[in-house]
Structures are given as C-alpha cells and as structure tokens.
Design a protein with these regions (language model features):
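C-terminal portion of ABC ATPase nucleotide-binding domains
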Residues: 325, 333, 342, 347-389
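A hydrophobic transmembrane-helix motif
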Residues: 47-96
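ABC ATPase nucleotide-binding domain helical subdomain, centered on the C-loop/LSGGQ "ABC signature"
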Residues: 206, 221, 239-280, 324-325, ...
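Cytosolic ends of transmembrane helices, especially the final helix of ABC transmembrane type-1 domains
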Residues: 7, 11, 30, 54, ...
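Helix-to-loop junction immediately C-terminal to a conserved catalytic motif
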Residues: 195
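Catalytic Walker B motif of ABC-type/P-loop ATPase nucleotide-binding domains
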Residues: 306-310
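Conserved signature/switch motifs of ABC ATPase nucleotide-binding domains
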Residues: 301, 332
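Loop segments that connect adjacent transmembrane helices in multi-pass transporters
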Residues: 4-51
C-alpha cells in the first residue's frame, strides 16, 4: 500500500545489501551498524503497518455500511414498485438475493489480493533469512593491533586440497611486504587468513605474539582491511559508502584520505562528485575507479594491517604512479601486504615473500632474492621479457 510500500522497499534494500555485502560488513565489523539500521526500519515498518491496519479497518467499515445502505435502498425501492404494481414481491426478494450474491464475490476478490500481498511479503522474509554457523565475534581478547604477523606450519585446506601447506613466515610490525608467486601458490588465501576470514586447519598464526584463535574477531577485523580488484559496496552514494565505515571522522581526515587515495581526482571527473550513486558492484564507475573508492573506504577505517590483493591490476599507469607517490602516507603506521603478479611493483616494498604451492620458498629484498631464490628470478625474468625491458 501507499502507507507501507516505501518502508517495505527500504527493508528489502537493507536485507539485500546485508546479504550481497555480507563480507564487506564482516570485514569492517559493521554488524552493529546494520543491526541498528534494520531495527530502525523495522520499527518504522511496525508503525506504518498499524496505520495501514487502521486504514484497512476504516475501508472495511465503510464497505459494510455502503453494503447495508444499498440493501435498504434496494428494499425501499422495491416496496415502492410493489405498491405501484410495477414489481411483484417475489421479484424484489430475488433482486435482494442476487445483489448479495454479487457483493460477496467482489469483496472476496479484493480480500484475495490483500492476502496475496501479505503472503508474498512473508515468503520474501523467509527467503531472505540465511541460515549458517555464527562466528565467534565478541568473544576473545580485545587487542590493539601493531601489525606483527607470524605463521608457524600453517595449513589451510579447501576440501582435500591444501592452499597453504606448512607456511612459515615472520613479518615485523609496520613492514611493507610484497607477496608474489605463480597462480595457485596461496597468495589470496594467505591474505584472507591475515584478514581473519579463514582459520588454519593446522599450525598457528599469531598477531603481535597472540594466537589469532583467541582474539575477538570483530575487534581484530576492525583494525584490518583487505582491498581486492572486485570490491563490493552498498547501494548508496560514494560519500555514504565512505562514512558508513567511520561516521565520526573529522572533515580534515576525510579530505586527507580522499587526497592520498587518489579519490579526489576521480571525483573531479564525475558530474555529481561525491554524491554519485553507485550500486553494490560500484557501477557506473570504471573498474579502476571502483578500487580507488574501495581504497579510500579502507583507509577510513584507519587499519593497522592493510592487505591489497591484486588491487592495482585495473589501475592505468598514471593512477599507479599516483598510488606509489602517496604510498608512504598510505602505509604510514601500518603493516602493508600486497599480493601481485606485476614484479615491477616489488621494488617499492621493504620485503618480498615468494610463495609456491602454499609454502614460502623465499623471503628478503629484491637484490638478494635474485641471487638466492630461483623462482623469484624466473618470475622477474619473465616479467622483464613481457615488458620489453
């Protein structure tokens, strides 16, 4: 109805955004925000529903009154016609019965459509309820992350396949690390492990000396951000997407993040600027601009660990140059790990980790790995040939 229609549409949008962007919600620990938004919309829906029921009751009463008036008018007119000799008593009784038979089906038709709408809403509600194991969010230690990551014999399996197969790694806090290796070597799995979305099947992963199993997930994720080449957003304006992560950020910090992420330049090219509406996939923005928005959103969270999974693959050359010009500011006070196939980018990092079949086969600086790690040298040589260097 006109009373409940808009609010029900808002409920559906909220549910759809929560389902489609569930990993984004988990990544930024936005569960309380989404829960609050849902409760506010549900409260409005209840109030609107009560108003709708009152309106429906009024319509029902009016319909009943009109039906009774119609019966009285029909009988009164019939009596006059009978007295005038134009109609028999049997005819008036027949007309009254026929009118009753006509009114009932018409009323039933309207009732059917009302019931059909209620049934559809119920099915929608049931259909959008997802069942799955709940995560251990608030339980665990509240820890201020510094950014140290240690993996000891970590194994992560998908079915019977080991994506990480005895990973041993030690990354100091506030280090800039490039993670390289052939496809299927475990780069993305490692980053998602660092994000807190995966758990080791065997072995131990420590954050600043604490086993990640004993940390509060929502507390840890709120200090860790992963950005990949296909980010997911909420159907809203660019500004609303950014502020959802950090509603109380100051205007100075907000503008600074727009500048260092490169989003300021992107916004200048958009007719509606920061008020541009985007859908969950970031359309109508180009793929590179979507990643820029995702980078700005990630920096809004002020993460202590920043994870980039092939995030620069859709950047053009000028955007890549701008990114690395601002990289010192982006990486300030953070541990940064970037998985990449573009070996030319590794020179910007303090350490390089080389993965193959889920294990570390090399770790160090570019010059050292060229001498000590055959796989790294092979990857570097192939990249140089492709680039014509």
């Amino acid at each position: 109805s006109k009373i409940t229609g808009p609010i029900e549409a808002s409920k559906r949008r909220t549910v759809q955004a929560s389902v489609a962007g569930i990993e984004t919600i988990k990544a930024f620990s936005l569960e309380p925000t989404q829960r609050k938004e849902w409760r506010q919309i549900s409260s409005s829906s209840i109030r609107r529903s009560v108003a709708g029921q009152i309106a429906n009751l009024a319509v029902t009463n009016i319909n009943s009154t009109l039906t009774q008036i119609m019966t009285v008018v029909l009988v009164f007119t019939g009596v006059l016609l009978v007295l005038a000799g134009s109609l028999s008593a049997g005819a008036i009784i027949s007309c009254n019965m026929l009118a009753g038979k006509l009114v009932a089906p018409v009323t039933a038709i309207f009732t059917f459509f009302a019931d059909l709408t209620n049934f559809k809403n119920t099915i929608d509600t049931v259909g959008t309820t997802w069942n799955g194991p709940t995560e251990r969010l608030g339980a665990g230690n509240q820890h201020v992350v510094k950014g140290g990551v240690v993996c000891r014999d970590v194994i992560v399996k998908f079915d019977d396949t080991a994506a990480l197969n005895g990973l041993n790694l030690d990354i100091a806090p506030r280090t800039k690390v490039a993670v390289v290796g052939p496809s299927g070597s475990g780069k993305t799995t490692f980053l998602r492990l660092c994000q807190g979305f995966l758990r080791p099947n065997m072995g131990a992963m420590e954050i600043d000396g604490q086993n990640i199993r004993y940390l509060s997930l929502d507390n840890y994720r709120s200090q860790t951000t992963l950005i990949d080449a296909k980010p997911v957003f909420f159907g809203a304006t660019i500004e609303e997407n950014l502020r959802k992560v950090q509603p109380n950020i100051s205007e100075r910090e907000f503008q600074e993040i727009l500048d260092i992420s490169g989003l300021s330049r992107v916004l200048e090219e958009l007719p509606d600027g920061i008020s541009t509406e985007i859908n969950q996939f970031g359309l109508p923005l180009s793929q590179g601009n979507r990643v820029t928005v995702a980078l700005a959103r990630g920096l809004m969270a002020k993460p202590k660990i920043l994870l980039l999974d092939e995030a620069l693959v859709n950047f053009d050359k000028s955007t890549q140059i701008g990114f690395f010009e601002n990289f010192p500011k982006i990486a300030e006070h953070k541990t940064v790990m970037m998985a990449t196939h573009d070996m030319r980018l590794t020179a910007e990092f303090e350490q390089i980790v080389v993965l193959e079949k889920g294990i570390v086969v090399g770790q160090g600086k570019h010059e050292d790995l060229l001498k000590t790690c055959p796989l790294y040298k092979e990857l570097w040589t192939m990249d140089q040939k492709l680039s014509g260097a």
